[in-house]
């Protein structure tokens, strides 16, 4: 399995160069047909790309990138966002305390961010405590504001170090680029005004230790170098290669995106500035995995078809389609003419769209022109249908193109919230939504009665309140008694407000009850 994983790169290389996986391969050069026996049939070698005439192999040494160094060098880092949480409290007359929380941003300092990151990585409880809401202070009949600053550390935030100009690239940076980390500049600004990016290593060195020496075989024809067989046995062509310096080392960028440093006698042009080395990400990893699975599957299908042919002593057009070479290069083409099995040498090329080889109805384009058929039969299982259309067995299954469409629809990369192009930031310094998931919830709360006094003060206040209450009750009772006394006297005589005269025992006339009362003790 491991050799197959290493040797599928030619097929993948063409897919990366052209932006999508080739859906088919067809001969652009087709030699004369000759009859063969079924024992001459063989499954093609889909693990080698061959160049015409370069058969002279000689040992040589070259330099290539270490495993894991693909398009750019990964630099791990983190983002630091400053958040201020404000607690506003108001205590009313009866002692109810209302607390309202608000959040806004501030721009953090690199030193503070580095300290917060170290706390988080070390599991220091000070980091979690720094994220808590402030404990609100309060005073009776006053509004009190309490603030607390927090630093939100989001990691990892991986950036790409460009080995060409040593700049950092990520969607979190304004314009996608940061000039780089130096001794004087230890951080990068981000597309959020109150967030900075910093590397995990406080003293990053330019990690250009990315090369390794390897040995292989040079494929040449005379003084011309056509390509080489690398240390893993994979042939790589120098067609379309260009010169490119990587971390100051001059080398060649091949068509499949790989980079090697080797001596050649041919003058090679310089690469355009926009060409990178081995563009590689998580999605291409998935594609590589599917390509390997597909190549293994196709190899097994070819061997099964070949075994069936040998066992049954019969062959069909559909079985011949399994013997087609799946990668560009030299191979064989097979067909059946007049019940005779035929073979021809062929040089295969990649096909990216079906229109390239079927430009019109009934036309199979080979070598720039429509290839003739014999009684409706072409080669490699391709036939002419009853309605005059060219029928290719793989056209119905679309081969690996289905995997590409599946990847486009199902692969969702994990990204930093600031790297999401759909993120819309709020105006001003209002706290963004992406920091809320890292902080406790804030809400308006109302406490019970609390006057903000110590325990002894509370008892004094309660005692004074009780005494005041008693005084008020006593005063009210006294007032009520005084107010009701004249009314009760009048009601005892059923009076209407007139004077009543009475006669005492001595016969003296007393004009009123008050006069009688003032006359001293009277015996009835």
Curated annotation (Swiss-Prot):
<keyword id="KW-0261">Viral envelope protein</keyword>
<dbReference type="InterPro" id="IPR055447">
    <property type="entry name" value="Rhabdo_glycop_CD"/>
</dbReference>
<dbReference type="Pfam" id="PF00974">
    <property type="entry name" value="Rhabdo_glycop_FD"/>
</dbReference>
<feature type="disulfide bond">
    <location>
        <begin position="178"/>
        <end position="188"/>
    </location>
</feature>
<feature type="disulfide bond">
    <location>
        <begin position="43"/>
        <end position="302"/>
    </location>
</feature>
<dbReference type="InterPro" id="IPR055448">
    <property type="entry name" value="PH_Rhabdo_glycop"/>
</dbReference>
<keyword id="KW-0449">Lipoprotein</keyword>
<keyword id="KW-0564">Palmitate</keyword>
<feature type="disulfide bond">
    <location>
        <begin position="208"/>
        <end position="247"/>
    </location>
</feature>
<keyword id="KW-0325">Glycoprotein</keyword>
<feature type="topological domain" description="Intravirion">
    <location>
        <begin position="481"/>
        <end position="524"/>
    </location>
</feature>
<feature type="disulfide bond">
    <location>
        <begin position="242"/>
        <end position="271"/>
    </location>
</feature>
<dbReference type="GO" id="GO:0036338">
    <property type="term" value="C:viral membrane"/>
</dbReference>
<keyword id="KW-0732">Signal</keyword>
<dbReference type="Pfam" id="PF24834">
    <property type="entry name" value="PH_Rhabdo_glycop"/>
</dbReference>
<comment type="similarity">
    <text>Belongs to the lyssavirus glycoprotein family.</text>
</comment>
<feature type="signal peptide">
    <location>
        <begin position="1"/>
        <end position="19"/>
    </location>
</feature>
<dbReference type="InterPro" id="IPR001903">
    <property type="entry name" value="Rhabdo_glycop_FD"/>
</dbReference>
<feature type="transmembrane region" description="Helical">
    <location>
        <begin position="460"/>
        <end position="480"/>
    </location>
</feature>
<dbReference type="Pfam" id="PF24833">
    <property type="entry name" value="Rhabdo_glycop_CD"/>
</dbReference>
<feature type="glycosylation site" description="N-linked (GlcNAc...) asparagine; by host">
    <location>
        <position position="56"/>
    </location>
</feature>
<keyword id="KW-0472">Membrane</keyword>
<dbReference type="GO" id="GO:0055036">
    <property type="term" value="C:virion membrane"/>
</dbReference>
<keyword id="KW-0946">Virion</keyword>
<feature type="disulfide bond">
    <location>
        <begin position="54"/>
        <end position="226"/>
    </location>
</feature>
<keyword id="KW-0812">Transmembrane</keyword>
<dbReference type="GO" id="GO:0019031">
    <property type="term" value="C:viral envelope"/>
</dbReference>
<feature type="lipid moiety-binding region" description="S-palmitoyl cysteine; by host">
    <location>
        <position position="480"/>
    </location>
</feature>
<feature type="glycosylation site" description="N-linked (GlcNAc...) asparagine; by host">
    <location>
        <position position="223"/>
    </location>
</feature>
<feature type="topological domain" description="Virion surface">
    <location>
        <begin position="20"/>
        <end position="459"/>
    </location>
</feature>
<feature type="disulfide bond">
    <location>
        <begin position="363"/>
        <end position="370"/>
    </location>
</feature>
<keyword id="KW-1133">Transmembrane helix</keyword>
<feature type="disulfide bond">
    <location>
        <begin position="80"/>
        <end position="113"/>
    </location>
</feature>
<keyword id="KW-1015">Disulfide bond</keyword>
<dbReference type="GO" id="GO:0016020">
    <property type="term" value="C:membrane"/>
</dbReference>
<comment type="subunit">
    <text>Homotrimer. Interacts with matrix protein. Interacts with host TRFC. Interacts with host BST2; this interaction inhibits viral budding by tethering new virions to the cell surface. Interacts with ITGB1. Interacts with host GRM2.</text>
</comment>
<comment type="function">
    <text>Attaches the virus to host cellular receptor, inducing endocytosis of the virion by using different host proteins including TFRC, GRM2 and ITGB1. In the endosome, the acidic pH induces conformational changes in the glycoprotein trimer, which trigger fusion between virus and cell membrane. There is convincing in vitro evidence that the muscular form of the nicotinic acetylcholine receptor (nAChR), the neuronal cell adhesion molecule (NCAM), and the p75 neurotrophin receptor (p75NTR) bind glycoprotein and thereby facilitate rabies virus entry into cells.</text>
</comment>
<protein>
    <recommendedName>
        <fullName>Glycoprotein</fullName>
    </recommendedName>
</protein>
<dbReference type="GO" id="GO:0098670">
    <property type="term" value="P:entry receptor-mediated virion attachment to host cell"/>
</dbReference>
<dbReference type="GO" id="GO:0039654">
    <property type="term" value="P:fusion of virus membrane with host endosome membrane"/>
</dbReference>
<feature type="glycosylation site" description="N-linked (GlcNAc...) asparagine; by host">
    <location>
        <position position="338"/>
    </location>
</feature>
């Amino acid at each position: 399995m491991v050799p197959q994983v290493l040797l599928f790169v030619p097929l993948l290389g063409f897919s990366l160069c052209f932006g999508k996986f080739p859906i088919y391969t067809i001969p652009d050069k087709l030699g004369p047909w000759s009859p063969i026996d079924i024992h001459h049939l063989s499954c093609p070698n889909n693990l080698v790309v061959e160049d015409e005439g370069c058969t002279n192999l000689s040992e040589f040494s070259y330099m290539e990138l270490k495993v894991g160094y693909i398009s750019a060098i990964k630099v791990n880092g983190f983002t630091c966002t400053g958040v201020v949480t404000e607690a506003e409290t108001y205590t009313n007359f009866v002692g109810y305390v209302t607390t309202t929380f608000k959040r806004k941003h501030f721009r953090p300092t690199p030193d503070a961010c580095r300290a917060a990151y170290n706390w988080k990585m070390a599991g220091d409880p000070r980091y979690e405590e720094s994220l808590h809401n402030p404990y609100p202070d309060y005073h009776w009949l006053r509004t009190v504001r309490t603030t607390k600053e927090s630093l939100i550390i989001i990691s990892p935030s991986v950036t790409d170090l460009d080995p060409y100009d040593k700049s950092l690239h990520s969607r979190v940076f304004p314009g996608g680029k940061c000039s780089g980390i130096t001794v004087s500049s230890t951080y990068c600004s981000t597309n959020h005004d109150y967030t900075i990016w910093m590397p995990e290593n406080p003293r990053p060195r330019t990690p250009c230790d990315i090369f390794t020496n390897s040995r292989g075989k040079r494929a040449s024809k005379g003084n011309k170098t056509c390509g080489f067989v690398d240390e893993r046995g994979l042939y790589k062509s120098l067609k379309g290669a260009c010169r490119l310096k990587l971390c100051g080392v001059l080398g060649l960028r091949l068509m499949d995106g790989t980079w090697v440093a080797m001596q050649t006698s041919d003058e090679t042009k310089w690469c355009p500035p926009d060409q990178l080395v081995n563009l590689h990400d998580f999605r291409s990893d998935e594609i590589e995995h599917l390509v390997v699975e597909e190549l293994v599957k196709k190899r097994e299908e070819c061997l099964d078809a070949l075994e069936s042919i040998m066992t049954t002593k019969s062959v069909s057009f559909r079985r011949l389609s399994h013997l087609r070479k799946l990668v560009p290069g030299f191979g064989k083409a097979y067909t059946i003419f007049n019940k005779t099995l035929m073979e021809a040498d062929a040089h295969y090329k990649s096909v990216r769209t079906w229109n390239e080889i079927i430009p019109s109805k009934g036309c199979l384009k080979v070598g720039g022109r429509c290839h003739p058929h014999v009684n409706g039969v072409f080669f490699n299982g391709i036939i002419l249908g009853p309605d005059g259309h060219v029928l290719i067995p793989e056209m119905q299954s679309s081969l690996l193109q289905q995997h590409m469409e599946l990847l486009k629809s199902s692969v969702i990369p994990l990204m930093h919230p600031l790297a999401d192009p759909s993120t819309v930031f709020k105006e001003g310094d209002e706290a963004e939504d992406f920091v809320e998931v890292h902080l406790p919830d804030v809400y308006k709360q109302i406490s019970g009665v609390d006057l903000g006094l110590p325990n002894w003060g509370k008892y004094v206040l309660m005692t004074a309140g009780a005494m005041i209450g008693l005084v008020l009750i006593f005063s009210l009772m006294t007032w009520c008694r005084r107010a009701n006394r004249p009314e009760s006297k009048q009601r005892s005589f059923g009076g209407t407000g007139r004077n009543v005269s009475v006669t005492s025992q001595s016969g003296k006339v007393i004009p009123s009850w008050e006069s009688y009362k003032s006359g001293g003790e009277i015996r009835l």
